[in-house]
Amino acid sequence: MLLLEGAGLALAEQYAHPGRELSPDLEERLLAALERRSSREPLSSIFASAFFCGHRFALNADCLAPRPETELLVETALELLKSRLPLQSRSESGSESKAESNSASRPASSSAAEPRLELAELCCGSAAPGLSLLWELEQLQKGSASLFLGDLSGGAIYAAMKNAAALGLDKSCRFALCDLFPPEKEETLFDLILVNPPYIPRAEIFGLMPEVRDYEPHLALDGGEDGLDFYRRLAASAAACLKERGWLLMEHGAAQEADIREIFADWSQSRGSAVISRCDAAGHDRVLAFQVSGRKDNALS
């Protein structure tokens, strides 16, 4: 991985030329990276980037490095939103002709008459989840969605803007410095809001592994005394930002689902909200989705 990131040598090239000698400059750079890694600095900090959903995202000191388990947010959001895209952008069953299949596999263009999906990622950091979701939707149908990205950190917003431009998605994005919720001037109601909020209980931060404790921004980790402060704020106010049948999709800690369900009890009782839960690859509860609706959306069972 150090050779791949530090030297730009692809894995195939490393396997094809295992005895290749490194230039003095390259050797010096790799030794410096090794020294930093030996002091427990993570690769995402050393190289100021990380891979997520198959894309490389630029990071800085104000961004939490995206985790593999967070890809579940994107996967779940795609399941929820695909049913809302116009029919021509969805893959049909195997009964269609080869010509039809090839046509369906190409991204369609959204017509002016078709409403765009309005998406938001709050506490966005590098915006890896939100931009990955938007990129996938663009492959299904060009111009099908727009994305609001908000964060309290100016450095995080800078990284999000850089990443949106790198993926060619900047024209479909809006950015704002905000304390969790969009500013009042942002009047859009959203079809789906993604949030990976800080959820580590404050007292536990200093017991985390050095790669996280010493190099990740505590602003992106600290969820208050019990780790649930942001979920309480979301439960109190997020519904006002969502369309009818809109979804609030959140990542959470492995042992927090029951507490978050209790915090959101009013959504289920008074709003008739649908609730979806997803586990990560390790079998830990990881994602909760609540729908603002008088009737349940059957996009997922």
Predicted segments with their positions:
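Residue-level signal for inorganic ion chemistry
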Residues: 2, 40, 70, 129, ...
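Conserved Class I SAM-dependent methyltransferase catalytic core
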Residues: 225-291
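Conserved AdoMet
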Residues: 3-80
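Mobile active-site "lid"/loop adjacent to the S-adenosyl-L-methionine
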Residues: 199-229
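Conserved SAM/SAH cofactor-binding pocket of Class I
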Residues: 72-90, 112-207
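A general structural signal for well-ordered alpha-helical segments in protein cores
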Residues: 27-30, 40-43, 126, 130, ...
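Intrinsically disordered, low-complexity terminal tails and inter-domain linkers enriched
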Residues: 82-116, 136-143, 268-270, 294-301
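Glycine-rich, phosphate-binding/catalytic loops in enzymes
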Residues: 136, 209-212, 266-267
